Curated annotation (Swiss-Prot):
The keyword Heme does not apply. GO terms for molecular function: ATP binding; ATP-dependent protein folding chaperone; unfolded protein binding. Transmembrane segments: none annotated. Acts as a chaperone. Pfam families: HSP70. The lineage of its organism: Bacteria, Pseudomonadati, Pseudomonadota, Gammaproteobacteria, Vibrionales. Residues 600-637 are annotated as: Disordered. The modification Phosphothreonine is found at residue 198. The gene is dnaK. This is Chaperone protein DnaK. Keywords: ATP-binding, Chaperone, Nucleotide-binding, Phosphoprotein, Stress response. NCBIfam families: PRK00290.1, PRK05183.1, prok_dnaK. Residues 623-637 have a biased composition (Acidic residues).
Length: 637
């Protein structure tokens, strides 16, 4: 069996490693660098990858693609993709299937297709070093990548001519690299991985029994749209805003200038990790009728920290959730490991140390640890490493939609993979001949708030009263974290299977909502209380509106009366149901319908007040001096 290489396919940089003897070794690329920029450029008849692509970016911004990992497995409509469209110099377009694709040199390409160019370079780098063809690889992904994003990463490998032997989570890979040669018994480590575009936290237990090491992931959490690129964008926006204040020119409309500012911002950010201030100096950045314009802006470390403080803070929330899911406190953590280039920022290191109450380990290379761990896993799969067992987990719960729009979970989040789970369901109506299996990923009880991974039909069910047929649904989650689903009619033996295909990524907001609201969904009492409150509000609204209608009498036009009566009867109908959202919507609809009634009630109240007012008030107006006034509109409301 040939060598299985380990590849860290990063947002900003990628790295390849291989097992050399019993130790992982990072391989230098053709340019002599240990990491390769994840930048791809399309020029006339040539595709450039890495440093050569980065070097020509200033003169070819619209055909130079970077941070493609932020788009992999995502839908065009995703909020994060829409945000990226505004800041990326290249074109992000909507594919026929709704995915986010890119366009360069007039050609539309899928994200896995572009990422495959980076993987091809990694493959070639390894082949040049080993002197033989390489076909097998272990590729890493952020722990919080969903099914679609994992599938898309596997597709990229296949396009690059690689057989992807395993997809493993980046923090887990880093733990493998770190713990492989560590002696001294059991330890519980926290891997804080802040890369170019994604953030993960994993709590991992390393057990050693008679020389065999088990790496067990206890919990994982993260944010698939938070990373160094976001830090860069904050600094880019600051520089552009400062330049606009000084020169009155908006550089955002100039792709060439923006590419120069991007490079300068990235360089300044790196410099500010080791110095307290730096100058961003870009001569001839643009020009207008008065001549050329130069950018010269001083940036201090304190300024940069103030620009990104909320991003660092955002990374701390998943730490709390991961510890709670692992049922541990900060005192139970033996070692803290920092992975990803953005963790070189002193502020990030300080905040993480403050959170865990201990300094992070300094003996881990944040740019290389993930690829080295992937190479170790490659060695395990190739049979070169015998004494290592890796137990990873699924980051989000998996289930299907059942009657009433409820998500029934078959696999809970943080379940060790591979895993298999099955459950028997039945029909919702008499003589139902087919069922639709709607597969979901997420933590919400209501199906509509989770990520839809796909659906399929099981047909040919024999006619029977509802609840009688037995349909067994099986979820098979493989070691790559990719889901295979089957549904079987136990009476007829008819079966339908699918492997969930990439249909788009999870948005940050969706993930955030899933985590935050997961706890709330466990509390049936809370749900009941909310429903009761909604019903009470509906009752009050109906009673109050009817009372106002009586008082308004003939002042309310007949068509308005009819509109309100319709809204009241719709609210009364919704009130009988169990759907709080439906009740709230109908309350809102009644408020809208009763707007005219509110105006009449207000006019009647004002008329009554006017009757009782002092008739002599008019004479006082003679002494009043007219004043000019200006209406101030508050746009923030």
């Amino acid at each position: 069996m040939g060598k299985i290489i380990g590849i860290d396919l990063g947002t900003t940089n990628s790295c390849v490693a291989v097992l050399d003897g019993d130790k992982p070794r990072v391989i230098e690329n053709a340019e002599g660098e240990r990491t390769t920029a994840s930048v791809i450029a399309y020029t006339d008849g040539e595709t450039l990858v890495g440093q050569p692509a980065k070097r020509q970016a200033v003169t070819n911004p619209t055909n130079t693609l970077f941070a493609i990992k932020r788009l992999i497995g995502r839908r065009f409509e995703d909020e994060e993709v829409q945000r990226d469209i505004e800041i990326m110099p290249y074109k992000i377009v909507k594919a026929d299937n709704g995915d986010a694709w890119v366009e360069a040199k007039g050609q539309k390409m899928a994200a896995p297709q572009v990422s495959a160019e980076v993987l091809k370079k990694m493959k070639k780098t390894a082949e040049d070093f080993l002197g033989e063809e390489v076909t097998g690889a272990v590729i890493t992904v952020p722990a919080y990548f969903n099914d679609a994003q994992r599938q898309a990463t596997k597709d990229a490998g296949r396009i690059a001519g690689l057989e992807v032997k395993r997809i493993i989570n980046e923090p887990t890979a880093a733990a493998l690299a770190y713990g492989l040669d560590k002696k001294g018994g059991d330890r519980t480590i926290a891997v804080y991985d802040l890369g170019g575009g994604t953030f993960d936290i994993s709590i991992i237990e390393i057990d050693e029994v008679e020389g065999e090491k088990t790496f067990e992931v206890l919990a994982t959490n993260g944010d698939t749209h938070l990373g160094g690129e976001d830090f860069d964008n904050r600094l880019i926006n600051y520089l552009v805003d400062e330049f606009k204040k000084e020169q009155g020119i908006d550089l955002k409309n100039d792709p060439l200038a923006m590419q120069r500012v991007k490079e300068a911002a990235e360089k300044a950010k790196i410099e500010l990790s080791s110095t307290s201030q730096t100058d961003v100096n870009l001569p001839y950045v643009t020009a207008d009728a008065t001549g050329p314009k130069h950018m010269n802006i001083k940036v201090t470390r304190a300024k940069l920290e103030s620009l990104v403080e909320d991003l660092v803070q955002r990374s701390l929330e998943p730490l709390k959730v991961a510890l709670a899911d692992a049922d541990l406190s900060v005192n139970d953590i033996t070692d803290v490991i920092l992975v990803g280039g953005q963790t070189r920022m002193p502020m990030v290191q300080a905040k993480v140390a403050e959170f865990f109450g201990k300094e992070a380990r300094r003996d881990v290379n944040p740019d290389e640890a993930v690829a080295m761990g992937a190479a170790v896993q490659g060695g395990v799969l190739a049979g070169e490493v015998k004494d290592v067992l890796l137990l990873d987990v699924t980051p989000l719960s998996l289930g299907i939609e059942t009657m009433g729009g409820v998500m029934t979970k078959l696999v809970e989040k943080n379940t060790t993979i591979p895993t298999k789970a099955n459950q028997v369901f039945s029909t919702a109506e008499d003589n139902q001949s087919a069922v639709t299996i709607h597969v979901l990923q997420g933590e919400r009880k209501q199906a509509m708030y989770n990520k839809s991974l796909g659906q399929f039909n099981l047909e040919g069910i024999q006619p029977a009263p509802r609840g009688m047929p037995q349909i067994e649904v099986t979820f098979d989650l493989d070691a790559d974290g990719i889901l295979h689903v089957s549904a079987k009619d136990k009476q007829t033996g008819k079966e339908q299977k699918i492997t969930i295909q990439a249909s788009g990524g999870l948005s940050d907001d969706e993930i955030e909502k899933m985590v935050q609201e997961a706890e709330a969904n466990k509390e049936a009492d809370k749900k009941f209380e909310e429903l009761a409150t909604a019903r009470n509000q509906a009752d009050q609204m109906i009673h109050g509106t009817r009372k106002q209608m009586e008082e308004a009498g003939d002042a309310l036009p007949a068509e308005e009366k009819e509109k309100i009566e319709t809204a009241i009867s719709e609210l009364e109908e919704a009130r009988k149901g169990e759907d709080k959202e439906a009740i709230d919507a109908k309350v809102q609809a009644l408020m809208t319908a009763a707007q005219k009634l509110m105006e009449i009630a207000q006019q009647q109240a004002q008329a009554q007040q006017a009757q009782g007012a002092d008739a002599g008030a008019q004479s006082k107006d003679d002494d009043v001096v007219d004043a000019e006034f200006e209406e101030v509109k508050d746009d923030k409301k």
